[in-house]
Amino acid sequence: MEAIAKHNFARISPQKARLVADLIRGKSVDQALEILTFSNKKAAVLVKKVLESAIANAEHNEGADIDDLNVAKIFVDEGPTMKRIMPRAKGRADRILKRSSHITVVVADR
């Protein structure tokens, strides 16, 4: 049985979020939560909330035992990019890309 949780339009670059996602892929949920708790990356906070939501979904919807769950799948897709302008010298302007992500976590029995 699987339980899914998503965070769409998370305000973090997909490249940075994938670094954290790679740390917990395939791990047990206890181990994954421990890794995310002590990680000092901004993405770790967002991924941890999604993982906790997936665990709660598994427990509530499927009646799963938390001790038997592991991170079956985790992936970070690219969301829409907000384009912003930064004024520069001599009337020029640079574009700033504020990237967003769609974080998906799937937990399943071992």
Swiss-Prot record:
GO molecular function, one term: rRNA binding
UniProt entry tagged with the keyword Signal: no
InterPro entries: Ribosomal_uL22, Ribosomal_uL22_bac/chlpt-type, Ribosomal_uL22_bac/org-type, Ribosomal_uL22_CS, Ribosomal_uL22_sf
CDD domains in alphabetical order: Ribosomal_L22
Superkingdom of source: Bacteria
A GO cellular component annotation in the UniProt record: cytosolic large ribosomal subunit
Keywords: Ribonucleoprotein, Ribosomal protein, RNA-binding, rRNA-binding
Quaternary organization: Part of the 50S ribosomal subunit.
Family to which the UniProt record says this protein belongs: Belongs to the universal ribosomal protein uL22 family.
HAMAP family: Ribosomal_uL22_B (MF_01331_B)
Protein name: Large ribosomal subunit protein uL22
